[in-house]
Regions:
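Secondary-structure boundary elements
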Residues: 150-156, 164, 181-185
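Conserved short loop/turn motifs at secondary-structure junctions
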Residues: 102, 159-166
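Hydrophobic pocket-lining residues that define ligand/cofactor binding sites across diverse proteins
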Residues: 14, 162, 179
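Short catalytic-site patches enriched in acidic/histidine residues
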Residues: 30-40, 126-130, 135, 166-201
Length: 201
């Protein structure tokens, strides 16, 4: 995956919003810009994405082998148990005065960064990223159509499956398994609801 256009549009949004740096941790914005999905650990993973210069992915040492840069220009900065990841991120931010931080960043990390970077203004990253991500490239539209078509085929195939005598969880598991077998990389959830209040799971 080539992230060049996404980086360009993100930096345009940062420039328009007068944002010096973007800090992303868990959530969907990180893989959107890097292809890497952070595990929700008690150890900090954070992308420091400056307006100018190469981004840096600060990641626990044990997780570093999972990171694939795909030849893209971001620095992977592993940290060990004896190092301070907040200090590493703070140093990477340098002179940044206005920083957008990921909305899903754990509070303990957000507060720690605000404490050491008290001189900075902190804003939600969604102020930038929603506008960047809402505009789809032709390739992204094609991928969305392909994903939707796959799910449509799975739903059509489920019409011939026995539903009675099964739990909603069991049916949801079958939907998930069929979707993964059809080529999806992941499936976060499937809502299967029946009976009273079934339309409001």
């Amino acid at each position: 995956m080539d992230f060049t256009d996404r980086w360009r549009r993100t930096r345009q949004a940062m420039e328009t919003g007068r944002v010096d740096a973007l800090c992303l941790s868990v959530g969907s914005d990180l893989p959107y810009l890097t292809g890497y999905t952070a595990m929700p650990l008690e150890r900090l993973t954070m992308l420091v994405f400056p307006l100018d210069g190469d981004p840096m992915l600060v990641v626990p040492e044990l997780e570093a082998p999972r990171v694939e840069t795909d030849g893209h220009d971001f620095v992977v900065r592993p940290w060990s148990e004896t190092q301070d990841p907040i200090g590493i991120v703070d140093a990477a931010l340098g002179d940044a005065r206005r920083v957008a931080i990921g909305d899903e960043t754990w509070t303990r990390f957000s507060l720690a960064l605000q404490n050491v970077g008290w001189q900075r203004a902190w804003i939600p990253a969604s102020d930038l990223m929603v506008g960047v991500r809402i505009v789809k490239t032709p390739d992204e539209v094609d991928r969305l159509r392909a994903a939707a078509a796959t799910v449509d085929r799975v739903v059509d195939a489920m019409a011939g499956v026995r539903w009675s005598g099964r739990t909603e969880r069991d049916v949801a598991r079958e939907i998930r398994d069929r979707t993964l077998e059809a080529g999806h990389e992941s499936m976060e959830f499937a809502i299967v609801a029946s009976g009273p209040n079934g339309a409001s799971p």
